[in-house]
Amino acid sequence: MAKPASIKIRLNSTADTGFFYVTKKNARTKTEKMVLKKYDPVIRKHVEFREGKIK
């Protein structure tokens, strides 16, 4: 069987609240670490979320 093109990643909040999003990305075309600005409901602000591994 072929290896899937998309992998699941965890986007961790840089505000150190412990909040995270789980999303998918194409590992073949997006080789760098993903950084997105999203909403953190714990502090009720938009902050950067950085890619981390799912345990």
From Swiss-Prot:
Organism superkingdom: Bacteria
GO biological process: translation
A Gene Ontology term for the protein's cellular component: cytosolic large ribosomal subunit
Disulfide bonds: none
Molecular function GO terms recorded: structural constituent of ribosome
Keyword check for Ribonucleoprotein: yes
Gene3D superfamilies in the cross-refs: Ribosomal protein L33 (2.20.28.120)
Keywords linked to the UniProt accession: Ribonucleoprotein, Ribosomal protein
Ribonucleoprotein in keyword set: yes
PROSITE patterns: RIBOSOMAL_L33
PANTHER family: 54S RIBOSOMAL PROTEIN L39, MITOCHONDRIAL, LARGE RIBOSOMAL SUBUNIT PROTEIN BL33M
Family membership: Belongs to the bacterial ribosomal protein bL33 family.
Protein name according to UniProt: Large ribosomal subunit protein bL33
Species of origin: Caulobacter vibrioides (strain NA1000 / CB15N) (Caulobacter crescentus)
